[in-house]
Structures are given as structure tokens and as C-alpha cells.
Amino acid sequence: MRRPIASTWIALRVLLAAGAALAANAVTAGAPAPAFTITDTSGNSVQLGDYKGRYVVLEWTNPECPFVRKHYSSGNMQALQKEFAGRDVAWLAINSTNASHSEFRTPRQMSDWMKSQAAAPAATLVDSASEMARAYSARTTPHMFVIDPAGKVIYNGAIDDKRSANLADVKSANNYVRAALGEAMSGKPVTVGVTTPYGCSVKY
């Protein structure tokens, strides 16, 4: 019995250490957004600099995650994407599931899933080596970041304050992303710039 317990304890320590490392390297509100160059599901190269002078939303996603499905099955994520696309916000969805993981989806599979959900991001990015996730210390799906036109992070955290996978919670939720964008685009300081994200772990 000792060996399995020891192995489990070691694995737990590794997971805790990894989580601590991500937290220590987290991109805080007010910090410059890490630059990235990554390929989207159509094979096009996408850089943060492509959206210079615009607000950018980064949405970490994974179709296998029930927390992600909560926001897509309810239409909540698509509504946000479309609402802010109409206000010239660049919304980028990122799947950072490592190519070696069982939940990995190919670019074609991700594209097909997004279409099946009637999603409307400006692009869906395939981070199959999890490099972009590490740069941003993305921890969960969903994990949301809002970047201002000057290239600084003004929000990092959960999509809302209802930390569940229950579709019924969406209607009564306080949506942090909508609030941050609304305040910033009105010339006001962002009241809540950092929250703790919730959801499934990013599959590094």
C-alpha cells in the first residue's frame, strides 16, 4: 500500500507545484500583454500586434469541458462574441489542449465545433504546444483576458461570478468580461481587474 500512496503524493505535489508556478507567473492587470504568434484553425498566422489599437478578448476554451459547454449551450459566449464584435473588439478563442492529450482537437475539429455552436470569435487559435497558455499562465477553461488598445491587460480571470457548470446560473451571473469592457470603453477605470478563474484545467 505504501508505494501507491507515495506515488499519489508525489503526483499531487507536482500538480500543486505546477499550479503555484502558474500563479506566480500570472499576468496581472496593468501589465503588458505577452506578445504571441500562433496559427488559427484556417492555418493563418495570428499575432497580438495585428490588433494594435483595439480591445482584444482572449478566451481559453475546450469543447470537452462542461464549464465551457455551459456558456456555449446557453448561448452566453456567442452573445458576448457578437455583442463586442459589433463594437470592434477582437475576440480570440484559444484551445491550448496539448497535442498529446486525449482531449486534443485538430484545427478542423475545432473549426467544425465552433461552427456547430454558431460561435463568432474573430479567430480560433490552436495552441497545441500550450506555449500561449504558459505565456499568459492560463489555468482553466474558460479563462478570460481583456487587453486594451495600448496592449495592457485590464482584466484577467473568470467569465462571471457563478462558479458552476449549471446553465441556469448564466442568467443571474455578474459577467466580469462585459463589465470590464463596458467600463474601459466608456473611459472609466475597470472596477474588477482580477478574479480567480474557474472551470476545467488547461490540458498542458
Residues covered by each model-derived region:
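Structural microenvironment flanking redox-active thiols in thiol-disulfide oxidoreductases
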Residues: 69-117, 128-135
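Loop/turn elements at helix/coil->beta-strand transitions in domains of secreted/extracellular proteins
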Residues: 53-56, 86-91, 119-122, 149-150
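Bacterial N-terminal signal peptides
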Residues: 9-22
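Short active-site neighborhood of thiol/selenol oxidoreductases, capturing the structured segment around
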Residues: 50-69, 181
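Short, internal strand/loop/helix patches
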Residues: 111-148, 153-154
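A short beta-strand-turn-helix
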Residues: 36-56
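N-proximal helix/coil linker or "cap" segments that precede and/or mark the start of modular domains
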Residues: 20-35
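Thiol-/selenol-based redox modules, centered on thioredoxin-like
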Residues: 146-204
